[in-house]
């Protein structure tokens, strides 16, 4: 089992249990989307000493936690679980890391992104996103979801997509390769 040096920030104890099946890592649980100042202080300390990986559920609450931590603790790494990998096996459950397979968790942790601390460059233009069919049209949402999976950056809406691409400095070559794969699969 692979040992992870950084501390992985997750939402709850069920996420910690599921991670233990996939990797050897220490975790810190936020216990919900309302992160306390004490928890943020712990994350800052851990970032300075060991590094931190934010690995939250692929839903609204998970994204909220991710943004809160990113704003308070610059330079953390991010792992994104594809939405379809976090679907519960039983009806009525919520989307989350606790439902992911060990293989899906290992894949997400193998494709980490680190935020740019200084002002990142915009490498992919608004025009590029329109040309790729990611902002308008009947299949735009589906294409964004698939692009997010391919690039390992999670799902975002059309308004957030340029920000996420810029934040993680996705290179144009990687972006267009992923778009080409989408186009090929649609044919």
Curated annotation (Swiss-Prot):
Its EC number is 3.1.26.8. Keywords: Cytoplasm, Endonuclease, Hydrolase, Magnesium, Metal-binding, Nuclease, Ribosome biogenesis, RNA-binding, rRNA processing, rRNA-binding. Its cofactor is Mg(2+). One of its GO terms (molecular function) is ribonuclease M5 activity. Residues 5-88 form the Toprim domain. The keyword RNA-binding applies. Mg(2+) 1 binds at residues 11, 57. It is found in: Cytoplasm. It is an enzyme of class 3 (hydrolase). One of its GO terms (cellular component) is cytoplasm. GO terms for biological process: rRNA processing. InterPro entries: RNase_M5, RNase_M5_C, TOPRIM_dom, TOPRIM_RNase_M5-like. The keyword Cell inner membrane does not apply. Belongs to the ribonuclease M5 family. Required for correct processing of both the 5' and 3' ends of 5S rRNA precursor. Cleaves both sides of a double-stranded region yielding mature 5S rRNA in one step. This is Ribonuclease M5. It comes from Lactiplantibacillus plantarum (strain ATCC BAA-793 / NCIMB 8826 / WCFS1). The lineage of its organism: Bacteria, Bacillati, Bacillota, Bacilli, Lactobacillales.
